[in-house]
Amino acid sequence: FNMESDSFEDFWKGEDLSNYSYSSALPPFLLDASPCEPESLEINKYFVVIIYALVFLLSLLGNSLVILVILYSRVGRSVTDVYLLNLALADLLFALTLPIWAASKVNGWIFGTFLCKVVSLLKEVNFYSGILLLACISVDRYLAIVHATRTLTQKRYLVKFICLSIWGLSLLLALPVLLFRRTIYPSNVSPVCYEDMGNNTANWRMLLRILPQSFGFIVPLLIMLFCYGFTLRTLFKAHMGQKHRAMRVIFAVVLIFLLCWLPYNLVLLADTLMRTQVIQETCERRNHINQALDATEILGILHSCLNPLIYAFIGQKFCHGLLKILAIHGLISKDSLPKDSRPSFVGSSSGHT
């Protein structure tokens, strides 16, 4: 394909983009190989809309409660609480964009270029900041449990600097989306929100494909496996009273992370290898990859509403904190509060939850 001899809009002619929405996958019109006729065995768009709506409601409720409980527990707030606060905020911001993405599944992108840039930016920032914060939590628990180091991690200014750095790095990594996203109006199909990078669109998009796979999955995953691996080893050797509970939380963190993001990133890796000619591309493989990307992306979206369940609802401290808030506002009796409840719903930065 020669971008210099054809205009960007001409390149969209004849393509079936009526059901295309935001994805890091490359759409069928950017294939370097011979054109393939896309199969119609795609995920029902109304089913996807229902999933988006459920994730939106669960994420909005769960992450709002997490933020509320952490903000109320100022006295006993731990380092892990600060990370969880930022994680919940990132997931909440992403959840607010889901109704727009759901509407675009049905009607195409009808919201203009400004919202195209804004909601795409929020989705990218959530992707990067969320996983980077998960990695920071694993490092914090590793230092506290394996090395019994709390002096460094308990310095408030350092924790704030780390969180601000994560948000800054996430914005930097998402900057290309803000710069190059716009509403595209193909002929005879619904408009889409996608990148327009001029003559080098295909090459730039391949570069941007590598960024989320590296910074957004591989590196944080290696950090989490390393930290949680040594943390579990230490817990097995030490006879701590809350060892089994800590192990359950850690296993839940790693397991849910892998279940949500590993399938999508494996398919994304296969797609990248195919587009770089490492794996021979056929029409059958291309259609299978496109269908797998659509299906596994839903798992990644589900992760935003599962985080409150992993980090909060599994532990008793969150429930205690929520009960305290209800008691303060007179919604329940103070007699129902546990006597040994603590303000921080994760206990301490050690991760013994």
Curated annotation (Swiss-Prot):
Q: Name one GO molecular function term.
A: C-C chemokine binding
Reported modifications of this chain: Phosphorylated upon ligand binding; which is required for desensitization.
Keywords from the UniProt entry: Cell membrane, Chemotaxis, Disulfide bond, G-protein coupled receptor, Glycoprotein, Membrane, Phosphoprotein, Receptor, Transducer, Transmembrane, Transmembrane helix
The organism's superkingdom is given as Eukaryota
Where would you find the membrane-spanning parts of this chain? 46-72, 82-102, 118-139, 161-180, 206-228, 249-270, 292-312
Q: What is its main location?
A: membrane
Looking up Gene3D superfamilies in the UniProt record yields: Rhodopsin 7-helix transmembrane proteins
Quote the subcellular location field of this record: Cell membrane
Query: In this UniProt entry, which residues form the Extracellular topological domain(s)?
Result: 1-45, 103-117, 181-205, 271-291
Q: Do you know which PANTHER family this protein is assigned to?
A: C-X-C CHEMOKINE RECEPTOR TYPE 2, CELL ADHESION MOLECULE
Name the family: Belongs to the G-protein coupled receptor 1 family.
Q: How does it assemble?
A: Interacts with IL8. Interacts with GNAI2.
Q: What name appears for this protein in its UniProt entry?
A: C-X-C chemokine receptor type 2
